[in-house]
Amino acid sequence: SSLRVRPGQAAVFLYQNKGTYDVITGPYDDVVRTENMPVLASIIGTAYKGGTPFPAEVYFINLSKGMELPFVIPFFRVIPSEPEYKAYDIEVAIKGAMTFEIPTRQEYLKYFLEAWGSSDTSMADFESKVKTLLTQEVKRVVSNAPKDTGIFIMHFNALIGELGRYICSRIQDPIAHRFGVFASGINIEDIRYDEESEGYQRLKRLTEDQTHLYNLENEKTALLGYEIQRQTMRT
């Protein structure tokens, strides 16, 4: 069979046992031959001058590295980590986008094909399914950030870049294991507090004269420490 794979695409050949596959990365415009596919060749050999017939499911995957999935998370509850302020929980809303890509490494393709292999998948299909998990994970990470890192809840906007990187490092595994995609970044566009709430008003009054007690550099280090640890583990 002839095969045309455009630049920025990959064709994944999934064989009958569903556990092995070959990947042809574009640009490619030629006849598919057994001899050009190492996994297939190891299964059935290279008989007939590389023209051995073989059954396989073929999936075309977008390899773009800058795909974005926007999200808007309505107000949800976040509790300060400081014991004296735990009574003053605050409602927080977040708007941003997840940047992602679809790697062709085996560990990602396994999850990707399990999640999406039963049918053609459009960007709309992807968004509708991933957004639910993405929202859950972002809420979980942000809700626990004060307790897990020591960041002061009123400093979220001052540390918006570091918070985005921290969120990304914490959601990468759940997103990959469920959908087979790599979350390469979380860009937070806006973080809003429910400034009309009693908890926000009281906490603001109690802490507005205590900003000297908090060190933003230490909080940045705490947020980025998890990301640095994960990068070290990958190398």
Predicted segments, located by residue:
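Hydrophobic membrane-anchoring helix/hairpin
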Residues: S1-Y111, W116-D120
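Elongated, amphipathic alpha-helices that form coiled-coils and helical stalk/scaffold elements used
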Residues: S64-T235
